A protein has these predicted regions:
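Conserved beta-strand/loop positions that form the S-adenosyl-L-methionine
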Residues: 30
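Short conserved loop adjoining the S-adenosyl-L-methionine
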Residues: 80-84
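A conserved beta-strand element that flanks and buttresses the S-adenosyl-L-methionine
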Residues: 91
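Class I SAM-dependent methyltransferase SAM/SAH-binding core
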Residues: 34-36, 40-79
Length: 195
């Protein structure tokens, strides 16, 4: 398995442990990039579906997953995705901020099985003084850990700046996903889980 480390892959162990709690789960990775997370999830999931709207990136993910019969990549957006059946787990890693938040959370909620789970490693915009202070306090630890892990800075993925602040994300999630757990993470990320 070809692997790399960056501020997103740093949270792969957290995602793997959550999926491992649901043996043989049907998992959707939205904005799956080059398929690294899907590849790591193969021992834990019964079926893996990756969505990647960028044609070249989707090809790279499909190449990575070639020979894994229970994993596939679809070159389409989440908005256009119509699954055959609900998912047990839906994952967004640094992809939710590329989409309109409320409609995406509503669709996610609708695509989950009755006991399904949403897992997000997301980015939020700095809007308030507190946001900027937290980000400033993370600079040194994030840089030191990036050096220690040998961060791969450019993995060829599509990037976009976050649109909503963490307060806005919390308010939207509170309204649409009652009981969602949201917390700040390291590396300028937030973590969301909802069942």
């Amino acid at each position: 398995m070809t692997t790399c480390w960056n501020h997103n892959t740093a949270y792969h162990p957290w995602i793997l442990s959550a999926v491992a709690e649901r043996p043989r789960a049907r998992v959707l990775d939205v904005g799956c990039g080059d398929g690294l997370l899907l590849e790591k999830l193969t021992p834990y999931a019964g079926e893996l579906v990756g969505l990647e709207p960028d044609t070249e990136t989707a090809r790279r993910a499909s190449d990575r997953l070639a020979g894994l019969p229970h994993a596939r990549v679809l070159t389409e957006s989440f908005t256009d995705h119509i699954p055959e059946q609900p998912y047990d787990v839906i994952v967004f890693v640094a992809s939710l901020h590329h989409m309109d938040l409320a409609p995406t959370l509503i669709k996610t909620r609708d695509l989950l099985s009755p006991d399904g789970e949403l897992i997000v490693v997301g980015l939020s915009a700095n809007r308030r003084l507190g946001d900027w202070l937290v980000s400033a306090l993370q600079v040194v630890p994030a840089r030191v850990l990036s050096l220690l892990h040998g961060e791969t800075r450019d993995t060829g993925m599509t990037v976009a700046p976050p649109r909503e602040s963490l307060a806005e994300i919390r308010a939207t999630a509170r309204a649409l996903l009652p009981g969602a757990h949201i917390r700040r993470g390291l590396y300028y990320r937030y973590l969301l889980r909802w069942r």
